[in-house]
From Swiss-Prot:
This is Putative F-box protein At3g42722. It comes from Arabidopsis thaliana. Gene3D superfamilies: 1.20.1280.50. Signal peptide: none annotated. It holds the Pfam family F-box. It comes from the Eukaryota.
Length: 129
């Protein structure tokens, strides 16, 4: 039952619109609110991801950014269109390690398959030439 002040009374389309204004990492944290909220962030048309949220002294925290973004892109509904993909990597990022460049390329290709119209990539100094 909905009360007049409850955010749960809002239609999914409006909630997805609201979630599209915050970082995808933060929008994903709303999935703990209820079963209804579990997948709402994945319907957002704007994916704005910043790996500094995941950059932690422990390496496995940094790898969790790769996993989070991989799962987010993989779980997009087939009909979902991405308007904007924004990826920000800071100097502490481990994206240079191992297959990092291939992973970023995969994310970009996946976004292109979903019709991305804006692509923002920010690599703070990483020593790449």
């Amino acid at each position: 039952m909905c009360c007049m002040a409850s955010i749960d009374c809002l239609p999914d389309e409006l909630l997805v619109g609201i979630l599209s204004f915050i970082l995808t990492n933060e929008a994903a944290s709303t999935s703990i609110l209820s079963k209804r909220w579990r997948t709402l962030f994945a319907f957002s048309h704007n994916l704005d991801c910043n790996d500094s949220i995941f950059c932690h002294p422990r390496k496995n925290k940094r790898k969790s950014f790769r996993y989070f973004l991989y799962k987010t892109l993989a779980n997009l509904e087939g009909y979902s269109r991405i308007k904007k993909l924004s990826l920000k990597f800071d100097e502490k990022s481990n994206i240079r390690e191992g297959h990092g460049k291939l992973v970023v390329n995969h994310w970009i290709c996946n976004a292109l398959e979903h019709g991305v119209s804006e692509l923002h990539l920010c690599f703070e100094y990483m020593g790449w030439y």
